[in-house]
Amino acid sequence: MTNRISRLKTALFANTREISLERALLYTASHRQTEGEPVILRRAKATAYILEHVEISIRDEELIAGNRTVKPRAGIMSPEMDPYWLLKELDQFPTRPQDRFAISEEDKRIYREELFPYWEKRSMKDFINGQMTDEVKAATSTQIFSINQTDKGQGHIIIDYPRLLNHGLGELVAQMQQHCQQQPENHFYQAALLLLEASQKHILRYAELAETMAANCTDAQRREELLTIAEISRHNAEHKPQTFWQACQLFWYMNIILQYESNASSLSLGRFDQYMLPFYQASLTQGEDPAFLKELLESLWVKCNDIVLLRSTSSARYFAGFPTGYTALLGGLTENGRSAVNVLSFLCLDAYQSVQLPQPNLGVRTNALIDTPFLMKTAETIRLGTGIPQIFNDEVVVPAFLNRGVSLEDARDYSVVGCVELSIPGRTYGLHDIAMFNLLKVMEICLHENEGNAALTYEGLLEQIRAKISHYITLMVEGSNICDIGHRDWAPVPLLSSFISDCLEKGRDITDGGARYNFSGVQGIGIANLSDSLHALKGMVFEQQRLSFDELLSVLKANFATPEGEKVRARLINRFEKYGNDIDEVDNISAELLRHYCKEVEKYQNPRGGYFTPGSYTVSAHVPLGSVVGATPDGRFAGEQLADGGLSPMLGQDAQGLTAVLKSVSKLDNTLLSNGTLLNVKFTPATLEGEAGLRKLADFLRAFTQLKLQHIQFNVVNADTLREAQQRPQDYAGLVVRVAGYSAFFVELSKEIQDDIIRRTAHQL
């Protein structure tokens, strides 16, 4: 890492995070002027107004220009989506348990007196609340499932970066002008053209700023850098990039611009090493210093950490630690099935090893063709302990997409958005994370409904749980589709849509079914706890008959605080096998019920003509979802977290080693989970020491690939180190750990999430 990159890192985290009202005020000012116009044009004009008037900056020593806010890591508001939670939490931002922000008293006043009164009863949230039935509201209030994405615009998507970089904005504007001439009444084309032209003007503002700064700069080297930024910006406003620096700059400008449009999570990076390779090679051919090109890439990686999302207190518990979702996958396959690993794949990992920050959320695609040098580079990066890169298995993901009707060429081009959500870059609107489904809560409801049922059998209970899962999936789909329609009618994203196939051919926004592939991704959470509970209940009550069903239910209601409660809990934990130990009897319960969940989910269509797709990953939602479930037959206390990850065993229950964990997960049909899965693994640093440790990890990754698991990720850290960080956070400000599908600064996590990471079983190879 160069001295410049070190200073950029330090500067990024030097100040307290603040909330900026600038986007909200500019958006609102435009909206007041466009009453009565079509929604998509109002949205486009509001975003264009922001691009014209928002304050811009180029920070000291930056090589890549473009900042969403002048102050680093500031949160921005979207009151047009949901103004109510913002009003409710204005006074809580600086002191809440997770993801704190400072906000001035004057900004609070402005929000209360100017912004909220305008958006009250005008927001997307008002529409959604007005459409939700009482039954759906009741299910969400008890957290049987959550309906997400009601407070921000659409993200969780990868735009067609090759189209942007290989054509350039000037050519894209010309193409859109033709569409407008051919269909002058099409509001989508009008909105997209308006925003493409506004993007050009916004980039030119940076060119002018860089020139002004250069004129006042007394340092010769910095003056030259600023003039180069100005030259690159003027080029990018009209022409396609020719060099790596130009490509990185246009890439970042567009990402920032899209943030203004939607203020969304996970505008992910896709297959960065594939579409950026020609520009990297061109710069090398032109004689650029490889060390400088690496510094450019490191600069870009640092920039990815400048964007943080302002979430509600509740949402911050589900998505703790700013999982911005700048996810990129490296390696993988070409469209004709060959290995796609290239020199930039290596450089992306090298640059990450230098910066070691939570973003970008890099992943590596493994397959039978992956070469040993790249696998060793991957293992070397994992060993650093930041949880990056995560690993995805082509041998599972490609067939999973084929099963969903995706072409073979497109399936081989898959990447990931957000945490682990599978997507086809530039062709998919997957509405990932639209809902999370609490499988253990459903079981708890069934247990309580059977109190006093002397005729209850295990098979009867299992059938009731299946039926109840099906019932609540129906309600989850209903709520998700209302939210989907809300985005269509209230929050279209025409600029984003202009970079998604086949929106231009159809003349429709992604929210209106314009994309080639239209999915709605929902997560089933708690499968490990569900199978552990049912296996123990079956043994204790129906086979061994040590307790009647009602007697066990009484112990659970009392949270094991009965005269025999602790003995009962000890037996439930210690006498009955748990998922994650390669025990068919309990693993098969997981496999059967997860398959049932998946098959029920995939029955349903969304308003865009696509289908719902199941996944199993938690982000950090296993903590809040566990808080609403009482004591359960796996020995879990009331309110205790659920198993982390998605397919991971419950904390402390994977007693037979890592190989057993992998074998348990391999018994689940990973190809059904086409919205993504997540498996957390924690290693002690000592087990990966030296060349031998790296080779063991590389061999382990090959075994993972052969076992046909979809995903795996790693923490490499001692629990003692994490406990010390809890006690002395000022000494561990740079400690990065894996949470669930993303990495975060350990000291920025709430204590409940920190404790969860500490308690995970540490394995050895």
For each of these PLM feature ranges, what is it?
Residues Q190-K201:
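Extended non-globular scaffold/tether segments
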Residues I203-E211, D273-L277:
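Extended amphipathic alpha-helical scaffold segments
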Residues T2-Y189, E225-T228, I232-L765:
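Conserved catalytic cores of very large enzyme subunits
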Residues A214-Q221:
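A conserved hydrophobic secondary-structure block that centers on an alpha-helix together
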